[in-house]
C-alpha cells in the first residue's frame, strides 16, 4: 500500500501535467475509468450484451460497452479520465509497460475520436515523465519502471509496426531490441508512433482500454527481474506492430478489453484487494495500474500475467469479458505458457500462411489472458512468425479498433513465450518440435518440478478458475492450445496453473521463478541447455502419454506432471537402459599378482574352460604339422581392433556365436576396460588381447614363411653358365644356380632363390613340388659337382652317372643333360644308357657323405678366407719357444706310455682326448726344433667331425711343447725364420690363401697325421710320404695333382697387370685381409711373373704394356678394350690357381672359368 500511495503521488504530478496537455484524453480516460472503476459492473453487462458465451465475444462486448459509454456519457468519461490519468501516471512509475499500453489505448481511442489522438500523444509524454520519475520509487516500483521503459519503446515500436508491413516485424523487433538500452530514443520514437496511431479511430478505443487494463494486470509487487527480462519480448511486440494492429481491428480490441478487465480484476484482487478504495474509481485506478503492469508483462513476458491468475471467485464475473484477461495476467506472474501460448501457437500452427500476428480473435475469444500468455511463443522468431500469420487471418475478420491491442498481445506473446521458455526447464527445440502434446507434457513436468510445493496448495483453487478458460480454449481452438503449449515447452504447467486462477497473493511469489526463467528465455540456447539435460529422458518417456492430457483441463496436466516426476528414476534400468552401463551379467573377475584385477566376459558356453579350449584349438590350427591349419582360425583373428584373417571356420555354429559376440561388443561398449573372452573366439579384452596379439603374430609366422610359388628364373645360356660356374668353387651360391638340396636323407633337384642369410643358409625351391626351404651350405650339391661313377635314382630305380652336363659350351650346359647307365639287380651297370634331364635325377645322402664332410671342413673362398698380405697381418702371433725343463715325474705314475706334452690340472683322460700321443721316451727331446709351422684355418676347433687331438689349438700346443714354432704370417718363412725349415700342416688340400701361397713358395704341405707319427715314434720322421697334393685339376677333377717342384719358374717371363676397382678389404679370422691386388700380386711374383702397376684410367696415355691382365668381377670395359688393342690375354684368378695346381700355365682360353665375362659376380658398369 505504501508503494501504491507513492505511485499515486507521482501519478498525481504526472496527471497534472497530462491534464493540462490532454483535454480530449480526459473524456477517453473517463470512459476507460468508468470501465475500470466499475470493473465488475462493466464486465457483467459486457457478458450480458454478448450473446456468445465465448470469451472472445465477452471481451468484444466489453470493448463495445466501453466505446458506447464513451459516446453516451462524455461527462462521466471525463471524470473517469482524470482519475485514469492519475492512475496511469502511477502505473508508469510502477511499470513502464503500463504507460505504453495506456498510450496504445489512447491511440485506439483517437482512432475512434480525433481529440483522443492528442491525448494519446500526451500520454507518451506522461510515459516519459514516469520513466524519469521511476528512480524515486521503491525497489518494486523501480523494477516495474524498468519494465515500463522497455514497454514504452515497445509500444512505440508496435505503433510503427502498425504502419509497416507484417514482413518488417522481425526486422523492427531486432532493431528495437538493439535500441532497448536507449530509452530516450525509444521514447521519442514511441511518441511519433503514437501520433501516427492517433489517426486510426476504431482500434484506438479498444487499445486504450487494453492498455489501461494491461498495466493493471501487471502487479506492482511482481519481481523486477521478470519485468526486466520481459524487455526483449516487448521489443518483439513492437516489431510485430502492424500485423498486430490488424489483429486488433478484428479481435484484438475485444480480447484486449476483456483482458484488461480481467487483468484489472485480478490485479485488484492481488494488490487492489488490499488497496481498494470504497470508490470504484480507486479500484479502477489500481486495476488500471495492474493492467498496465500486466500488459507490460504480457508484452515482455506474458508468463507473469498468466501466473498471476486471480482467484476464481472474484474474477468469475469478469471472466466473461475482462476476467479472462485478468486470469492471463495472473498466469503471467507464474507461467502463462500453456494457456496463452497454446492458443497463439495453435493458431500460428494452423494458420501458417497467415501474417506475423497470432490469432488474437479466437485466442482472445477463447481466453484473452491465454492470448497474452501465448506470446511466450515469441521465444523464437519462428513462433513469432507463426503468431503473425495467425494474426493476419484474424485481422481480416477483426475490426480496426482492436488493432493496437493485438500487436501488444502479439509482442506480449513473444515476450511471454520467451519468459515461459526461460521459466520452463524443458529444452526449447523439443517443445517447438513437439508443438503440441509433447511440449505440454514437458511443460507440465517442469512446472511441477519448479513449483511442486506452492503450486500444490493452489492447484485446487486454480483448477476451478482455470477450467473455465481451459474449456474456452478448447472450444476456441484446441489445436492452437496444443501447439502453443508445445512451443512453450518449459512453462506449460505454470501457465495452466495460472489459467486455473491461483490467488494473486500466491502468484506474486511464483513470478520470481518465472522471471528468472524469462531471463533465460532471452537466451533460448541457455534455456534449452538448462532444461534439456535433466528432462530429455522424461520427455521421451512421457511423449506418448502427453497427447491424452493436452486436450483436457489443466487439472490433469499438473497431477500428470507430478506423477511422471515421481515415476522418473534416472537409475531405472527399464527406462534408462540406453544411458546405463551394461548389466554385470556373465562378468568374471580374476585377481592376479600385485593386486591386479581383471574382468572377463564369459561366453555362452557353460564350460569353465571354454576359453582355454578355444585358444588351444586356434593355436593347434596354426602349427605346420597340423593338417587342419587352413580350416582353423588364428588368435590374430580373435584380437579386437585388427583386421581379421579370412579363415573360414568349418563349424557353422561357431561362426554364428562369433558373429553374435561381435555384435555384443559393438553394442555394449563401456568406459570400463573389461576383458572379453567368450567362447566365440572374439575376445574384447585389452590386456590379454595384446598378449594374444603378440602370440598370434608368432604363431602365424610359419604359414607366413611359406613363400609363394616363384617361377624358375629363365636365364640366358651365358648367364646360366656364369651362375653355375662361379669363379671359385668355395664362393657362395648365386641365385638361379642349379643344385641338389637335401631333404630327408635325399638330394633333390632345386634352384637357389636368394643369397646366403646370416646363418649361412640358402633359400631353395625344389623343382618337383615348388616347395621352398632353407638349406645349409653342407646340404647343397651344385650341378657342377656331379662326378662320374656316382649312384643316382631315376624313376625309383638306381642308375649310375656316367657324365654331367658339358660346360665347354654355354648352350650345352644350359640344357643340363646327364648320361646315365641302368643298373641290374646286382647293382652292376648294364649296357643300357640314357640321356636325361638334370631335374629327373636324385641322389642318396650316403653317396655324398664324403663331399658333405669336406664341405663342413672346407674354408671359404680365397677372396674371403684367411687371405692376408705380408704387410697387413698385424695380428700375427709371435712364435713361442718350448722350455727345455723336464716335465714333472708325477705324470708317469699311471704307467701310460702316452703322456700329455702339456702340464696342467686336467685329468689324464681329458689329456688323451685333446692332445696327440707322445712317446714317453721322446718327452723333452724337442723333436721339432729348427722347424716353423703354419696351420691352415681348415683345422677349426669348432668342427665336430675333427678329432680333438687334431684341432688347431691342440696341434699348436703339441708343436710348441716339442720345440716347434707356430706362425700365422706368410712372410715369416723367409724374413723372420729364414734359417728354419717351413712346413704347412693341414688335413687335406685347400684353395685358401695360405695353402696357395705355400705352394707358390715351394713350402711342403704336410698332412697332420705326420705330427701324430712323430709323437708315436718320438722323433721327427720323414714327411715325404705325408705331403699333400696341390689340388684337383679343372680339366680332370678325378685326378689330384702333386705340388709343383719349381713354382718360381711357372710364370717366369710373363708380364701381368692386376686390375680391380674393388678397394674394400676382406675380414678374416686373423684380422683385416687384403684387396684383390694385394692378395694376388705377391703370389704372381713368387711364381716368377713380372707385375706392373698402373692406373687403369691412364693406360692409353701411358701406353703400358703387359701380356696378361688379371681381373675380378669389378673390371672396367676400358681395360678390356685396351688389353685387346695390345693383344694381352684376359684371365681370372682361376687361371693362376690352375697354374699352381697343374705346375704349368694353361692357355688363357682353355676353360670358360678363365673368361672374365663369365664371372657370376661381375659388376656391370
UniProtKB/Swiss-Prot annotation:
It comes from the Eukaryota. The lineage of its organism: Eukaryota, Metazoa, Ecdysozoa, Nematoda, Chromadorea. Expressed in germ cells. GO terms for biological process: DNA damage checkpoint signaling; DNA repair; positive regulation of transcription by RNA polymerase II. It comes from Caenorhabditis elegans. GO terms for molecular function: histone binding. Its main location: nucleus. The gene is hsr-9. May have a role in DNA double-strand break repair following gamma-irradiation. The keyword Transmembrane helix does not apply. Residues 98-114, 123-140, 149-162, 397-408, 446-461, 662-671, 694-708 have a biased composition (Basic and acidic residues). Induction: Induced by DNA damage cues including gamma-irradiation, and UV and hydroxyurea treatment. Residues 306-317 have a biased composition (Polar residues). One of its GO terms (cellular component) is nucleus. The keyword Nucleotide-binding does not apply. Residues 163-179, 211-230, 280-289, 533-543 have a biased composition (Acidic residues). PANTHER family: TP53-BINDING PROTEIN 1, TUMOR SUPPRESSOR P53-BINDING PROTEIN 1. Disruption phenotype: Reduced number of apoptotic cells following gamma-irradiation. In a rad-54 knockdown but not in brc-1 mutant background, restores levels of embryonic survival and chromosomal aberrations in oocytes following gamma-irradiation to almost wildtype. Mutants show slightly reduced levels of egl-1 mRNA expression. Keywords: DNA damage, DNA repair, Nucleus. This is Protein hsr-9. It is found in: Nucleus. InterPro entries: BRCT_dom (IPR001357), BRCT_dom_sf (IPR036420), BRCT_p53bp1-like_rpt1 (IPR047249), BRCT_p53bp1-like_rpt2 (IPR047250), SH3_Hsr9 (IPR056492), TP53BP1-like (IPR047252). Residues 923-1028 form the BRCT domain. Residues 16-26, 415-431, 554-563 have a biased composition (Low complexity). PROSITE patterns: BRCT. Residues 1-26, 70-578, 608-713, 874-913 are annotated as: Disordered.
Amino acid at each position: 500500500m505504501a508503494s501504491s500511495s507513492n505511485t499515486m503521488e507521482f501519478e498525481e504530478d504526472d496527471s497534472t501535467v497530462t491534464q493540462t496537455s490532454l483535454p480530449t484524453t480526459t473524456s477517453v480516460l473517463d470512459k476507460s475509468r468508468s470501465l475500470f472503476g466499475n470493473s465488475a459492473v462493466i464486465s457483467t453487462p459486457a457478458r450480458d450484451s454478448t450473446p456468445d458465451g465465448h470469451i472472445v465475444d465477452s471481451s468484444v462486448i466489453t470493448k463495445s460497452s466501453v466505446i458506447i459509454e464513451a459516446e453516451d456519457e462524455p461527462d462521466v468519461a471525463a471524470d473517469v479520465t482524470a482519475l485514469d490519468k492519475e492512475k496511469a501516471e502511477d502505473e508508469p512509475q510502477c511499470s513502464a509497460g503500463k504507460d505504453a499500453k495506456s498510450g496504445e489505448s489512447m491511440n485506439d481511442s483517437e482512432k475512434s475520436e480525433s481529440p483522443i489522438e492528442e491525448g494519446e500523444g500526451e500520454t507518451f509524454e506522461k510515459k516519459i515523465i514516469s520513466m524519469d520519475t521511476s528512480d524515486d520509487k521503491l525497489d518494486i516500483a523501480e523494477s516495474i519502471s524498468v519494465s515500463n521503459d522497455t514497454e514504452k519503446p515497445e509500444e512505440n515500436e508496435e505503433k510503427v509496426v502498425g504502419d509497416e508491413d507484417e514482413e518488417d516485424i522481425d526486422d523492427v523487433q531486432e532493431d528495437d531490441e538493439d535500441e532497448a538500452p536507449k530509452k530516450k530514443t525509444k521514447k521519442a520514437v514511441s511518441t511519433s508512433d503514437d501520433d501516427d496511431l492517433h489517426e486510426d479511430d476504431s482500434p484506438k478505443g479498444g487499445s486504450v482500454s487494453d492498455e489501461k487494463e494491461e498495466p493493471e494486470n501487471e502487479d506492482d509487487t511482481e519481481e523486477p527481474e521478470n519485468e526486466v527480462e520481459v524487455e526483449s519480448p516487448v521489443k518483439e511486440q513492437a516489431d510485430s506492430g502492424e500485423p498486430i494492429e490488424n489483429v486488433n481491428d478484428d479481435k484484438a480490441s475485444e480480447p484486449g478489453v476483456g483482458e484488461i478487465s480481467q487483468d484489472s480484476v485480478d490485479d485488484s484482487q492481488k494488490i487492489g484487494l488490499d488497496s481498494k478504495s470504497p470508490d470504484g474509481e480507486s479500484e479502477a485506478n489500481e486495476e488500471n495500474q495492474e493492467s498496465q503492469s500486466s500488459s507490460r508483462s504480457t508484452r515482455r513476458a506474458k508468463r507473469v500475467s498468466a501466473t498471476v491468475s486471480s482467484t476464481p471467485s472474484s474474477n468469475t464475473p469478469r471472466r466473461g469479458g475482462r476476467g479472462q484477461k485478468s486470469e492471463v495476467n495472473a498466469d503471467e506472474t507464474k507461467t502463462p505458457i500453456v494457456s496463452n501460448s497454446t492458443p497463439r501457437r495453435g493458431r500460428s500452427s494452423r494458420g501458417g500462411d497467415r501474417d506475423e500476428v497470432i490469432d488474437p480473435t479466437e485466442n482472445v475469444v477463447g481466453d484473452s489472458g491465454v492470448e497474452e500468455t501465448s506470446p511466450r511463443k515469441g521465444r523464437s522468431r519462428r513462433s513469432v512468425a507463426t503468431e503473425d500469420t495467425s494474426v493476419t487471418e484474424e485481422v481480416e475478420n477483426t475490426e480496426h479498433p482492436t488493432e493496437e491491442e493485438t500487436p501488444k498481445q502479439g509482442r506480449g506473446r513473444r515476450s511471454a513465450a520467451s519468459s515461459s521458455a526461460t521459466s520452463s526447464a524443458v529444452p526449447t527445440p523439443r517443445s517447438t518440435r513437439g508443438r503440441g502434446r509433447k511440449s505440454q507434457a514437458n511443460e507440465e513436468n517442469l512446472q511441477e518440478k519448479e513449483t511442486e510445493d506452492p503450486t500444490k496448495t493452489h492447484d485446487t483453487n486454480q483448477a476451478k478458475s482455470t477450467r473455465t478458460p481451459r474449456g474456452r480454449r478448447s472450444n476456441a481452438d484446441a489445436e492452437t492450445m496444443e501447439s502453443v503449449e508445445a512451443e512453450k515447452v518449459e512453462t506449460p504447467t505454470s501457465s495452466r496453473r495460472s489459467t486455473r486462477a491461483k490467488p494473486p497473493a500466491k502468484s506474486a511469489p511464483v513470478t520470481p521463478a518465472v522471471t528468472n526463467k524469462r531471463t533465460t528465455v532471452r537466451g533460448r540456447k541457455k534455456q534449452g541447455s538448462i532444461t534439456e539435460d535433466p528432462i530429455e529422458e522424461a520427455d521421451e518417456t512421457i511423449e506418448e502419454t502427453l497427447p491424452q492430457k493436452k486436450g483436457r483441463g489443466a487439472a490433469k496436466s499438473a497431477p500428470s506432471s507430478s506423477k511422471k516426476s515421481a515415476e522418473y528414476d534416472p537409475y531405472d534400468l527399464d527406462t534408462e537402459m540406453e544411458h546405463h552401463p551394461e548389466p554385470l551379467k556373465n562378468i568374471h573377475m580374476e585377481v592376479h599378482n600385485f593386486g591386479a584385477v581383471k574382468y572377463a566376459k564369459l561366453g555362452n558356453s557353460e564350460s569353465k574352460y571354454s576359453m582355454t579350449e578355444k585358444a588351444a584349438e586356434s593355436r593347434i590350427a596354426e602349427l605346420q604339422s597340423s593338417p587342419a591349419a587352413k580350416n582353423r582360425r588364428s588368435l590374430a583373428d580373435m584380437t579386437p581392433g585388427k583386421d581379421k584373417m579370412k579363415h573360414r571356420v568349418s563349424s557353422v555354429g561357431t561362426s554364428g556365436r562369433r558373429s553374435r559376440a561381435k555384435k555384443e561388443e559393438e553394442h555394449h561398449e563401456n568406459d570400463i576396460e573389461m576383458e572379453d573372452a567368450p567362447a566365440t573366439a572374439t575376445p574384447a579384452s585389452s590386456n590379454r588381447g595384446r598378449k594374444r596379439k603378440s602370440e598370434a603374430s608368432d604363431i602365424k609366422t610359419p604359414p607366413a614363411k611359406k613363400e609363394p610359388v616363384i617361377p624358375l628364373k629363365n636365364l640366358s645360356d651365358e648367364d646360366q653358365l656364369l651362375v653355375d660356374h662361379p669363379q671359385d668353387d668355395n664362393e657362395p651360391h648365386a641365385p638361379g644356380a642349379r643344385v641338389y638340396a637335401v631333404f630327408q636323407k635325399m638330394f633333390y633337384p632345386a634352384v637357389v632363390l636368394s643369397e646366403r642369410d646370416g646363418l649361412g643358409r640358402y633359400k631353395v625351391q625344389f623343382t618337383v613340388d615348388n616347395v621352398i626351404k632353407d638349406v645349409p651350405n653342407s646340404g647343397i650339391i651344385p650341378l657342377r659337382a656331379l662326378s662320374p661313377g656316382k649312384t643316382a635314382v631315376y624313376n625309383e630305380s638306381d642308375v649310375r652317372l656316367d657324365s654331367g652336363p658339358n660346360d665347354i659350351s654355354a648352350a650345352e650346359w644350359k640344357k643340363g643333360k646327364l648320361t646315365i647307365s641302368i643298373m641290374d639287380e646286382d647293382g652292376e651297370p648294364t649296357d643300357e644308357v640314357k640321356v636325361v634331364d638334370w631335374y629327373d635325377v636324385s641322389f642318396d645322402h650316403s653317396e655324398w657323405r664324403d663331399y658333405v664332410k669336406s664341405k663342413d671342413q672346407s674354408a671359404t673362398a680365397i677372396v674371403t678366407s684367411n687371405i692376408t698380405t705380408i704387410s697387413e697381418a698385424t695380428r700375427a702371433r709371435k712364435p713361442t719357444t718350448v722350455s727345455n725343463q723336464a716335465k714333472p715325474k708325477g705324470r708317469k705314475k699311471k704307467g701310460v706310455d702316452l703322456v700329455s706334452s702339456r702340464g696342467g690340472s686336467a685329468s689324464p683322460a681329458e689329456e688323451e682326448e685333446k692332445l696327440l700321443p707322445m712317446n714317453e721316451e721322446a718327452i723333452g727331446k724337442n723333436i721339432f726344433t729348427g722347424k716353423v709351422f703354419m696351420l691352415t684355418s681348415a683345422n677349426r676347433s669348432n668342427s665336430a667331425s675333427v678329432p680333438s687331438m687334431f684341432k688347431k689349438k691342440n696341434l699348436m700346443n703339441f708343436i710348441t711343447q716339442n720345440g716347434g714354432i707356430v706362425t700365422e704370417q706368410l712372410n715369416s718363412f723367409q724374413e723372420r725364420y729364414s734359417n728354419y725349415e717351413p712346413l704347412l700342416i693341414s688335413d687335406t688340400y685347400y684353395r685358401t690363401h695360405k695353402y696357395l701361397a705355400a705352394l707358390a713358395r715351394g713350402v711342403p704341405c704336410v698332412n697332420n697325421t705326420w705330427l701324430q707319427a712323430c709323437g708315436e715314434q718320438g722323433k721327427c720322421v720323414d714327411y715325404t710320404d705325408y705331403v699333400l697334393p696341390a689340388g684337383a685339376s679343372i680339366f680332370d677333377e678325378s685326378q689330384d695333382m702333386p705340388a709343383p717342384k719349381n713354382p718360381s719358374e711357372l710364370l717366369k717371363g710373363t708380364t701381368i697387370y692386376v686390375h680391380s676397382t674393388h678397394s674394400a678389404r676382406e675380414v678374416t679370422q686373423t684380422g683385416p685381409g687384403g684387396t684383390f691386388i694385394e692378395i694376388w700380386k705377391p703370389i704372381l711374383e713368387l711364381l716368377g711373373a713380372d707385375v706392373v702397376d698402373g692406373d687403369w684410367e691412364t693406360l692409353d696415355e701411358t701406353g703400358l704394356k703387359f701380356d696378361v691382365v688379371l681381373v675380378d668381377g669389378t673390371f672396367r670395359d676400358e681395360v678390356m678394350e685396351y688389353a685387346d688393342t695390345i693383344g694381352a690375354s684376359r684371365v681370372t684368378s682361376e687361371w693362376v690357381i690352375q697354374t699352381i695346381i697343374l705346375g704349368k700355365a694353361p692357355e688363357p682360353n682353355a676353360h670358360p672359368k678363365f673368361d672374365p665375362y663369365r664371372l657370376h659376380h661381375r659388376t656391370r658398369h
